[in-house]
Amino acid sequence: MMPMAACDGSNADPILPEQPGQPGNSDGGDEDDSTNPTNPIPGGNGRYLVLYCSRTGSTERMAQQIQQTLDCDILEVEPQTPYESDYNGMLNRAQEELAAIRQGNYPAIKTSVEDFGNYDIVFVGYPIWYGSMATPMQTFLHNHASKLAGKRIALFASSGSSGISASVD
């Protein structure tokens, strides 16, 4: 099952269609890919963009399924410094980053998009960490808030325990 939510930039409620998981579970993410983190991989349908961040690959697989179904552009949101493969080290870093975000300090990411003008819908996928949107995606959305204003956004998330609703408060 793939929960999704969407909104259209208005203040209306979303349209509806805990902890980071262990590798192989359902929180997404991943290693090196030789694509440029500022250029979406183009698909045949340029009206949609799938943005995602993923640590273990679960969210990435969901993003790829959407991309293949819609034949649209796709782009991975990557942290500036990759996460450790050590699970406990990753958990510590995730907790530190979430605490920093609550103080208004967002962790650095490599990914940026110059213009969303051609996209009708932007799909945003992320793992849920400690009940929250994964920090790389929080940073991306914070950095691109003005460029995304008024766009239709469709959320999808992977989680081993938490639901999507608390991750978008």
Predicted segments, located by residue:
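Charged helix-capping and loop-helix junction motifs
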Residues: P136-H142
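C-terminal motif of bacterial Sec signal peptides marking the signal peptidase cleavage site
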Residues: M2-A6
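Glycine-rich, N-terminal phosphate-binding loop of Rossmann-like dinucleotide-binding domains
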Residues: Y126
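Bacterial signal peptide processing site
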Residues: C7-N11
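Short, glycine-/small-residue-rich phosphate/pyrophosphate-handling segment
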Residues: A154-D169
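N-terminal beta1-alpha1-beta2 submodule of the flavodoxin-like/Rossmannoid cofactor-binding fold
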Residues: P14-I121, G131-M133
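Short, conserved loop/helix-junction motifs that constitute active-site signature segments
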Residues: F116, H142-G150
